[in-house]
Amino acid sequence: MSDFQREQRKNEHVEIAMAQSDAMHSDFDKMRFVHHSIPSINVNDIDLTSQTPDLTMAYPIYINAMTGGSEWTKNINEKLAVVARETGLAMAVGSTHAALRNPRMAETFTIARKMNPEGMIFSNVGADVPVEKALEAVELLEAQALQIHVNSPQELVMPEGNREFVTWLDNIASIVSRVSVPVIIKEVGFGMSKELMHDLQQIGVKYVDVSGKGGTNFVDIENERRANKDMDYLSSWGQSTVESLLETTAYQSEISVFASGGLRTPLDAIKSLALGAKATGMSRPFLNQVENNGIAHTVAYVESFIEHMKSIMTMLDAKNIDDLTQKQIVFSPEIMSWIEQRSLNIHRG
């Protein structure tokens, strides 16, 4: 594939993603908090700091991996980096493979660091890149963490995608052992299982982003790029973010879990944190805001999102993220069926 074709693919991904609509209903609607009428705290008591063994984020939301590798996507990364700088959010760039192949593309990613020199930035590579390239991806952005995306359904629907996955787990293990910053194993919208969590724990992984279905749908994106658009029947493949978080419950004391995939509102973010996530990522909401409404409007959107999270936490009498994990939740019969059939232990305080 030529560099021009790769740039074209990056642009197609963004165009199709922006055209996708948010789901009217999701599994976040199938879980409810129990309301208690009189909080014992005030809004000003709320601490939204997200703390993991290696990373401290001012807020438990971040701009998740999206793009880079073309002139248009450079402009997107530039604007998102300004939003991150002005709001204090962490930001992940999209796959840096284009820059690792072609130095001319590096600035489509490094613009994020240029615009946000003091901010927290995650670099991003695939599970098949050599260790040396993973190290290079971290150095490229002076990144505080490295996402490794695992996207086998996307690759298999992508006309020119990868068809070989046998070496992925061993390669991830090699990268984790060599890279000095936290390595986050990130799904791309298909969710994670307890079996995967076991395998990742065995090779020393300390961070995951479950990225469940419900947000940007890469099966649909790649199917749109197929000549016959003949794999639409896979549109609903995978676990939702709620199901994925429940799958991680037994591993949350050893692995820091981030949540993304289909988060629409501050309440969805709070529900993710209550299920054990340390932070929550969003992609398309930020992309649509910054492209359709500009930087200032997107900054205001983030600030409002944060204030709404504080209001919800006050209603829940939760001063911090850890308090949220002790709050009472009622699940729908459908979610309870998943929990029972998958033999998940979700005992809560």
Swiss-Prot record:
GO terms for cellular component: cytoplasm. Its cofactor is FMN; NADPH; Mg(2+). Disulfide bonds: none annotated. InterPro entries: Aldolase_TIM, FMN-dep_DH, IPdP_isomerase. It catalyses: isopentenyl diphosphate = dimethylallyl diphosphate. Belongs to the IPP isomerase type 2 family. This is Isopentenyl-diphosphate delta-isomerase.
